[in-house]
Amino acid sequence: MRQRILVVDDDASLAEMLTIVLRGEGFDTAVIGDGTQALTAVRELRPDLVLLDLMLPGMNGIDVCRVLRADSGVPIVMLTAKTDTVDVVLGLESGADDYIMKPFKPKELVARVRARLRRNDDEPAEMLSIADVEIDVPAHKVTRNGEQISLTPLEFDLLVALARKPRQVFTRDVLLEQVWGYRHPADTRLVNVHVQRLRAKVEKDPENPTVVLTVRGVGYKAGPP
């Protein structure tokens, strides 16, 4: 079955270009030009990924992202202008998985989309643990004391990457390559913001983490200390 991408952008020419590129790569696409309507479209179309512009009529992309994240783990990639530095951070904190700066090359966009859609349906049985958090990898399930912790697919991938090598300290660049699929230097804020989001969900006390630890000046590792 072809995967469906929802393009949320009020720039008709850009939306048309994205549709042509994505359909050429084998994806189904739908286009919405209004933020409020995008929320309805996600519920009705159940897309596999959302390409979300920050500046939208009706409701801006940051608010759309925040509302979607309240009850959906659908991957979200923001489309943003180079001047939107503050908004990029706000978007990531609101739940976006990645972002791409305009103007961008079609190949770069497709690579980001494919990286967020990667899933292996034939994963072997694998159980991991960090501190008191248990991870059932093929079931994409995280629990503490039998209670399930709801993570987005990207947050789950980040936790698994750390848990698989509990003694390794990961630099932000390494995590960008392993979790986001980047093959070139990129913005390490992606990692920092997602670690904060992950800690807010898996730590008993995010200010004193025992699951995802910071190694000052280097990066992150799995806990406990």
Swiss-Prot record:
Modification after translation, per record: Phosphorylated by MtrB.
Record domain Response regulatory: where: 4-117
Keywords for this protein: DNA-binding, Phosphoprotein, Transcription, Transcription regulation, Two-component regulatory system
Domain of life: Bacteria
Signal peptide start-end: none
Keyword GTP-binding: no
Protein name: DNA-binding response regulator MtrA
Gene Ontology molecular function: phosphorelay response regulator activity; transcription cis-regulatory region binding
Listed PANTHER family: DNA-BINDING DUAL MASTER TRANSCRIPTIONAL REGULATOR RPAA (PTHR48111:SF21), REGULATOR OF RPOS (PTHR48111)
Any GO CC annotation of this UniProt entry: protein-DNA complex
DNA-binding region, residue intervals: 125-224
PROSITE patterns: OMPR_PHOB, RESPONSE_REGULATORY
4-aspartylphosphate: residues bearing it: D53
Single GO biological process annotation from the record: positive regulation of DNA-templated transcription
Function, in words: Member of the two-component regulatory system MtrA/MtrB.
Keyword Membrane on entry: no
